[in-house]
């Protein structure tokens, strides 16, 4: 194989190497950063939960905690398998809009592409997530992720493997049309994973990057179910009116993303929650 010759190894060995690197890298970020947050707050400051926890009175029972970690580990390995295989496909000359030489599109475009990719991945995640909240998909797949009403850092990818595959594909779709440097894409995947871990941490966090919603934005998604579908940003929820409203009722059975009216709303201005 051409790519095998280029790296001085057989195709199978190259594939195995890429899958191993992607899997180990993913597991190290996930359990390294997630584990550190868990130890720092859930272990060391458990008795002072009111000071740091978004839902200070809610902790997962031990069996659900262990189940969440097992499912997440399987999904991270699945993610490594997919990402490594995708890298092998690209190295072998498979089609994508990724490029390796920054001079090919210029430095200015490469910098702009960071923003474009971020918004494209966010859009992809928002619409996929909204789709997962349709009754059938929610009941059969997305319900797994919503078993964690008070999520911990380990629950970021505690989800049905079918859902994990859907989200993984949705994150990869933009790079088939948007030219992006390969390192920008890899960096973006790590960035999104780290912020996702913070957003599932259950810890009160106000991100230093001003475009990010606070960690309460996604934590509320787990409490109220069908609202706040965005991943890092509240933009798409604001645009579609799916941001949580103080004046509406939400719950597992209230589908549609806009809650249910509590009383007569005639003439009333919607009261959206600030995150
Ligand atoms: Zn959801
Ligand atoms: Zn979640």
Locations of regions flagged by a protein language model:
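Short acidic/polar alpha-helix capping motifs at helix-coil junctions
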Residues: 106, 137-138, 180-182
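Functionally important transmembrane alpha-helices
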Residues: 178-239
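Residue-level detector of transmembrane insertion/anchoring sites
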Residues: 112, 119, 136, 150, ...
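Acidic (Asp/Glu-rich) catalytic motifs at the cytosolic membrane interface
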Residues: 124-150, 199, 203-204, 212-226
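Non-catalytic, topology-defining segments of multipass membrane proteins
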Residues: 1-127, 131, 140-143, 148-169, ...
């Amino acid at each position: 194989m051409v790519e095998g010759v280029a790296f001085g190894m057989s195709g199978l060995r190259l594939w195995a190497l890429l899958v191993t690197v992607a899997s180990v890298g993913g597991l190290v970020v996930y359990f390294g950063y997630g584990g550190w947050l868990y130890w720092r707050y859930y272990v060391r400051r458990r008795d002072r939960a009111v000071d740091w926890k978004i839902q200070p009175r809610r902790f997962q029972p031990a069996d659900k905690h262990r189940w969440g970690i097992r499912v997440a580990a399987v999904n991270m390995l699945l993610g490594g398998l997919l990402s490594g295989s995708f890298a092998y496909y690209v190295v072998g000359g498979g089609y994508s809009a990724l490029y390796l030489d920054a001079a090919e599109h210029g430095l200015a475009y490469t910098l702009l592409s960071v923003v474009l990719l971020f918004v494209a991945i966010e859009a992809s995640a928002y619409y996929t997530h909204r789709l997962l909240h349709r009754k059938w998909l929610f009941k059969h797949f997305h319900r797994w992720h919503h078993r964690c009403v008070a999520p911990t850092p380990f629950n970021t990818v505690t989800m049905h493997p079918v859902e994990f595959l859907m989200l993984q594909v949705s994150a990869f779709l933009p790079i088939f049309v948007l030219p992006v440097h390969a390192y920008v894409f890899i960096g973006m995947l790590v960035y999104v994973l780290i912020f996702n871990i913070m957003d599932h941490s259950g810890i009160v966090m106000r991100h230093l990057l001003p475009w990010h919603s606070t960690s309460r934005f996604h934590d509320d998604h787990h409490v109220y179910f069908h609202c706040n579908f965005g991943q890092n940003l509240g933009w798409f929820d604001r645009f579609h009116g799916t941001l949580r409203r103080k004046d509406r009722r939400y719950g597992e059975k209230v589908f549609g993303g806009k809650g249910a009216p509590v009383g007569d709303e005639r003439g009333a201005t919607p009261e959206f929650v600030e995150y």
